[in-house]
């Protein structure tokens, strides 16, 4: 994605950047409305995820993560913006008349042809089982459970690598650096997710952040003791504790949040790099 600078006419445009303008004109049968669920609250109305709320209304686009139109070629008709994710999406017209959205593979353009199946070419945008891919293939939209649809490497610019196949399992290196085992029968899409430069974009002003549904983040050290364990003191006082804590007194910044003895621990050969 090309990053463009605004002319410095106002303070917000002076600091902001914008990516390539991709319009969105979604099909009515592939979208539906969704309610904002609590803005970071649980069923009792208590904040469980801070700094969420507001934001622009969104229509959800139905994305085909399963890619179960087997052995039927499809043509990329449009490349569209999706407000629900940082990757772009493609509208595919299949030969049997079916129309679906998929994640936009990097380098794909309007008019390209894709297909999914067991014996399809190893080319960008095609979906096939890991057992039919050569080692070193760059992939995204990877299934964890057979037939459930892709769950791994779906963000903008995400790409995983097939590094080994042995027995019933394949070894993948994920974008986080984690190395784990997955069934060879699971499917994945060849290539990298598009919109690679999204993390280089600067919003430029607070209002752009609010449009995304993200509220301001306030440091605990500038609060009162009633609001945060780090609060209080005269002037710029230290937090008064050995380690930083959350507003509810639990250890923060480094505490592992993964559940112990999870079923997938045996499938992870190397933890993600920090």
Curated annotation (Swiss-Prot):
The lineage of its organism: Eukaryota, Viridiplantae, Streptophyta, Embryophyta, Tracheophyta. Keywords: Chloroplast, Plastid, Ribonucleoprotein, Ribosomal protein. Part of the 50S ribosomal subunit. HAMAP family: Ribosomal_uL2_B (MF_01320_B). It is found in: Plastid, Chloroplast. SUPFAM superfamilies: Nucleic acid-binding proteins, Translation proteins SH3-like domain. GO terms for molecular function: rRNA binding; structural constituent of ribosome; transferase activity. One of its GO terms (biological process) is mitochondrial translation. InterPro entries: NA-bd_OB-fold, Rib_uL2_dom2, Ribosomal_uL2, Ribosomal_uL2_bac/org-type, Ribosomal_uL2_C, Ribosomal_uL2_CS, Ribosomal_uL2_dom3, Ribosomal_uL2_RNA-bd_dom. PANTHER family: LARGE RIBOSOMAL SUBUNIT PROTEIN UL2M, RIBOSOMAL PROTEIN L2. Residues 1-23, 223-274 are annotated as: Disordered. Coiled coil: none annotated. Residues 7-23 have a biased composition (Polar residues). GO terms for cellular component: chloroplast; mitochondrial large ribosomal subunit. Belongs to the universal ribosomal protein uL2 family. It comes from Nandina domestica. This is Large ribosomal subunit protein uL2cz/uL2cy.
């Amino acid at each position: 994605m090309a990053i463009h600078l605004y002319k410095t006419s106002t303070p917000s445009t002076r600091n902001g950047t914008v990516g390539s303008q991709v319009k969105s004109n979604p099909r009515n049968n592939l979208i539906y409305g969704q309610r904002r669920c609590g803005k970071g609250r649980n069923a009792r109305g208590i904040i469980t995820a801070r700094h969420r709320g507001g934001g622009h209304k969104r229509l959800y686009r139905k994305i085909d993560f399963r890619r179960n139109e087997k052995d039927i070629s499809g043509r990329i008709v449009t490349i569209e913006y999706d407000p629900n994710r940082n990757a772009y999406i493609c509208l595919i017209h299949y030969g049997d008349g079916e129309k679906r959205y998929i994640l936009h593979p990097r380098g794909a353009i309007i008019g390209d042809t894709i297909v999914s199946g067991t014996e399809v070419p190893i080319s960008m945008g095609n979906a096939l089982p890991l057992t039919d891919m050569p080692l070193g293939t760059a992939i995204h939209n990877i299934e964890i459970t057979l037939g459930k649809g892709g769950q791994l490497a779906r963000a903008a610019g995400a790409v995983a690598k097939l590094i080994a196949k042995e027995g019933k399992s394949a070894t993948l290196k994920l974008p986080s650096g984690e190395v784990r085992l997955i069934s060879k029968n699971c499917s994945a899409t060849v290539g990298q997710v598009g919109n690679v430069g999204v993390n280089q974009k600067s919003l430029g002003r607070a209002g752009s952040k609010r449009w995304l549904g993200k509220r301001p983040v306030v440091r605990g050290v500038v609060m009162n003791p009633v609001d945060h364990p780090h609060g209080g003191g005269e002037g710029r006082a230290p937090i008064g504790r050995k380690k930083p804590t959350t507003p509810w007194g639990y250890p923060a910044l480094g505490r592992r949040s993964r559940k112990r003895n999870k079923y997938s621990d045996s499938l992870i050969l190397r933890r993600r790099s920090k």
